Every structure is written in structure tokens, then in C-alpha cells.
């Protein structure tokens, strides 16, 4: 799950898809590749928790509803400690999160990418068997250029794009239910047509849900059936179970 820029809610979309897949009975893991700005553990109620070892392997933390998570924040003594690592160290950590973690049998492993198309993205595409990409955007003027970068990267790495999700598309008036496009009219249909992408969903600004994520309650607060097209696109991929290790 990636975006060309920060602040579009990519981690929330990752968490939402993971939660819905788990509700469908799938075994799900989330590899948090946003090493310097991880938010997945907090979203899943793992603040203050740390990974443990099983021999030479790390054990991912498991959420209340069974989602397995591996993140740099789970390795730190305090979750507010900065991760002052250079690029090669970050790349090595991501490879370890994949190859030296005892994921057990899982159906789907979602990778929450950092913003942009730099070293981390290259490491993930070269080191992990990536079956598909979900692009996350917001309704802003730069969306076309940002999507173009993601599309070009996917083509160069020969990875299929499952589709695009637009977050923060609108806010619903609490009194009349009218949709207010606070960031302007969405350009998603035009961009999707230009790059031949499937639209996997548009999400509103939801302050209550954002607050629940900050409290680590995404699994209980997420409405049923959120992002059904995105979940179906992931489920259409033939699952590859990891080894028991």
C-alpha cells in the first residue's frame, strides 16, 4: 500500500484493509515498512509492546483480532524514540522483517510503505514477492503527478496495480448528511481513466474514526464493509502461505 506523498492516510487504508480481511476469516499480517514514521502498532493497540524472539527469528505482535504486525516501533524501548538510521540500515531492517520474522501461515501480508518512491520502495519490490499495489491519494491538484510516479514505478518493477483509493474525499454534514468536498472536487475519475486504474473506493474525513485509530481501536471502530472493492481486489490474488517458520 503506497502513496507518492505523505499525509494522505496510507497507513489507515492499510489498517482498514487488514481489518476487513481478518473479518473475512483470512490470516493477515502487516509489515510496517515506514521505518522512520511507523503508525501501524498504535492503530492496532500495540503501544508499549515489544517483539520477542524465537531462536533466531522475531515473533510479530498479534492484535486483539489476530492481525500480526512487525514494525520498527516494536523494537524501540520507547515508541517516541526517533529512528536515526541511514538508508542501507533501513533497507536491511525491512529485509529482516520479511525473512527473519516468524510470520507463521498467513494468507495475506500487507506492506505499509513510507511516502514516495525511493530506497524503501526499491528494497520492498526487489526483496519481497509483491503480488499487487494499492495506491492511496487525496483530492488535491498534485494527485495526477503523484499517481504517475507510482504507476511508472510499478511498471518498471513489473508489479500489477490493483487500483487506487482516495482518502479524505469529503466530509459529511452531521445535520443534513450533505457531502462537502473540503479539498475541492475530486480528480479521481479523470486520473483513473488516464492511467487505466480501477477505483477501489473513496473515503470521507471521519474525526471519530481517526480518534479511534489514535486510541488503538481500529479493529472495533471500523465500520463493516469499508473499502469492499479494495478487499475484493486483494482477495482475488491467489494466497501464498508463508512457511511455518
What kind of region is each of these model predictions?
Residues 8-16, 38-41, 113-121, 143-146:
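Short glycine/serine/threonine-rich phosphate/pyrophosphate-binding segments
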Residues 1-32, 151:
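Walker A/P-loop phosphate-binding motif and the immediately C-terminal alpha-helix
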Residues 70, 113, 126, 162, ...:
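Glycine-rich phosphate-binding loops of nucleotide-dependent enzymes
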Residues 27-80, 84, 91:
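Phosphate-binding loop that captures ATP/GTP phosphates
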Residues 104-111, 117, 129-150:
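Conserved Switch II/interswitch segment of TRAFAC-class P-loop GTPases
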Residues 151-245:
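C-terminal lobe/tail of nucleotide-utilizing enzymes
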Residues 6, 32, 40, 70, ...:
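Residue-level signature of catalytic and energy-coupling elements of molecular machines
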Residues 76-124:
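Phosphate-binding/switch loop-helix module in NTP-utilizing enzymes
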Amino acid at each position: 500500500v503506497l502513496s507518492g506523498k505523505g499525509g494522505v492516510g496510507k497507513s489507515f487504508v492499510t489498517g482498514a484493509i487488514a481489518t476487513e480481511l481478518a473479518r473475512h476469516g483470512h490470516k493477515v499480517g502487516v509489515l510496517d515498512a515506514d521505518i522512520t514514521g511507523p503508525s501501524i502498532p498504535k492503530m492496532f493497540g500495540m503501544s508499549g509492546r515489544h517483539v520477542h524472539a524465537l531462536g533466531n527469528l522475531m515473533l510479530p505482535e498479534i492484535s486483539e483480532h489476530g492481525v500480526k504486525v512487525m514494525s520498527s516501533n516494536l523494537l524501540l524501548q520507547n515508541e517516541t524514540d526517533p529512528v536515526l538510521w541511514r538508508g542501507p540500515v533501513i533497507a536491511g531492517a525491512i529485509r529482516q522483517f520479511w525473512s527473519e520474522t516468524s510470520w507463521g501461515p498467513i494468507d495475506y501480508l500487507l506492506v505499509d510503505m513510507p511516502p514516495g518512491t525511493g530506497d524503501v520502495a526499491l528494497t520492498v519490490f526487489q526483496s519481497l514477492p509483491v503480488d499487487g499495489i494499492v495506491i492511496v491519494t487525496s483530492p488535491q491538484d498534485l494527485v495526477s503527478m503523484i499517481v504517475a510516479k507510482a504507476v511508472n514505478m510499478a511498471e518498471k518493477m513489473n508489479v500489477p496495480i490493483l487500483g487506487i483509493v482516495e482518502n479524505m474525499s469529503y466530509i459529511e454534514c452531521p445535520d443534513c448528511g450533505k457531502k462537502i468536498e473540503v479539498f475541492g472536487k475530486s480528480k479521481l475519475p479523470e486520473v483513473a481513466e488516464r492511467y487505466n486504474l480501477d477505483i477501489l473506493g473513496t473515503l470521507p474525513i471521519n474525526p471519530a474514526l481517526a480518534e479511534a485509530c489514535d486510541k488503538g481501536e481500529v479493529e472495533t471502530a471500523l465500520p463493516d464493509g469499508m473499502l469492499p472493492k479494495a478487499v475484493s481486489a486483494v482477495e482475488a490474488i491467489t494466497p501464498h502461505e508463508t512457511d511455518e517458520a
